[in-house]
Amino acid sequence: MASSSTSISLLLFVSFILLLVNSRAENASSGSDLDEELAFLAAEESKEQSHGGGSYHEEEHDHQHRDFENYDDLEQGGGEFHHGDHGYEEEPLPPVDEKDVAVLTKDNFTEFVGNNSFAMVEFYAPWCGACQALTPEYAAAATELKGLAALAKIDATEEGDLAQKYEIQGFPTVFLFVDGEMRKTYEGERTKDGIVTWLKKKASPSIHNITTKEEAERVLSAEPKLVFGFLNSLVGSESEELAAASRLEDDLSFYQTASPDIAKLFEIETQVKRPALVLLKKEEEKLARFDGNFTKTAIAEFVSANKVPLVINFTREGASLIFESSVKNQLILFAKANESEKHLPTLREVAKSFKGKFVFVYVQMDNEDYGEAVSGFFGVTGAAPKVLVYTGNEDMRKFILDGELTVNNIKTLAEDFLADKLKPFYKSDPLPENNDGDVKVIVGNNFDEIVLDESKDVLLEIYAPWCGHCQSFEPIYNKLGKYLKGIDSLVVAKMDGTSNEHPRAKADGFPTILFFPGGNKSFDPIAVDVDRTVVELYKFLKKHASIPFKLEKPATPEPVISTMKSDEKIEGDSSKDEL
């Protein structure tokens, strides 16, 4: 029995040794194959360069492209102070007494902004010269504003999650929080007096009493839009809720009265139940009546939904109304100037049914300042008017109306969008007639079919035709495609990121190279961050490919060895013909 047990143990031991040896042999073979493949590619590259092929030197991604997220790049501009403004040295600044400036982290941020009715918060970076210059002014303002508003600062380099949440793009960025909600970016003077004046105005009583007809007539004449409350009393809970809602709005005034005669001047009937509230505008839609619970939140939502025009013309002034709105979904009409009178009344009629759910926008397609650029961003081409829904948030999805521009059709589009029944529209070049080249051409309409094919590993370059870095990289990428064309499991592809789009293909600059592993397409692609050479890209693919592959090198021609005798005649050789 012992002998049998010993034999089994010995057999298992021998089997383990054999497996280990085989595994090492396979690994050695695999490593040897990779070394051989890399040596081949390096030799090919060397040959190219020795014949005047030139080389490509890694540079920063080209950021001249415009992604138009929230149409941000319709105008080139932006803040003065951005990441990287620290390529200089300055004299050390004297110490500043910041005793009244709170230091926030993710652990105390929510409590701080929630406990202070008015909280100003600066996101800064220690290396930022503009932040350092602001420090003494900010500290002095904090001391003067004690009891009225609280000031704080956050090191964005340490609190990355908060910086990402509030989409910090440059330093310093200063926000005003009202009752725990971020309401406004401070863009005033970076001085103590500038900060104090601005904050005092924001924190001052923002609701005004009207007790005489003369006051009412003056307000109605002067104000382009206003909110008016008819209350049981000018003090107490109703007035407090209205005042709290008023602090959330910067661009219109709030008024209140307890007089039925004055209320009537503001389109409120004397017999109506109090509290009553209206929003008056000197626009096509002149009046909106509030019919919700008389609370700060409900009033603020009503005002936000009704303060904008039914349809906003996309202009410099209109853009701020669109992007500062708390409503992110946009329903957009694209039409030329000579067709706007026909279609705008239709859009306004639809807008009445979807307040608070969409911002309705009109883009004049033939307007040189904005219309042409916005139409191009959305991929709206041709002369015919079009309507589409745009999500306006990070995913930036678009849904186009396929049908006549009628009230019913546009309402159905809006309702189907809200019910998540629509298929997104992607900007796309026409499908390529022939797509059998070494590098596959991807457009918006074949992205799913090729890039998201689970049976393939796909390397995708997103480029721009005008991008110099892309032009320099093109011959290298084409060579990689040529070397790998015979590998069925691997696709080397490219997409023009200026005329095609897909939510899975996000580019922060050009060129952007993404890798989509086979069998794993539900996850985000891998950003390829290696030197842009054939060898380094090949090494990346060997490491990350879900489906193992081996480079198919061109066969080396065998040397021809002659075995003919000296007196044999070559068939068909006319030089041996008789005289």
Curated annotation (Swiss-Prot):
- Induction profile: By chemically-induced ER stress response.
Q: Which keywords annotate this record?
A: Disulfide bond, Endoplasmic reticulum, Glycoprotein, Isomerase, Redox-active center, Repeat, Signal
Where along the sequence does the record put site: Lowers pKa of C-terminal Cys of second active site?
A: 532
Where in this chain does the record put each Thioredoxin domain?
81-204, 416-546
Which regions form coiled coils?
A: none
PROSITE patterns registered for this protein in UniProt: ER_TARGET, THIOREDOXIN_1, THIOREDOXIN_2
Transmembrane regions: none
Source taxon at top rank: Eukaryota
Query: Under what name is this protein listed?
Result: Protein disulfide isomerase-like 1-3
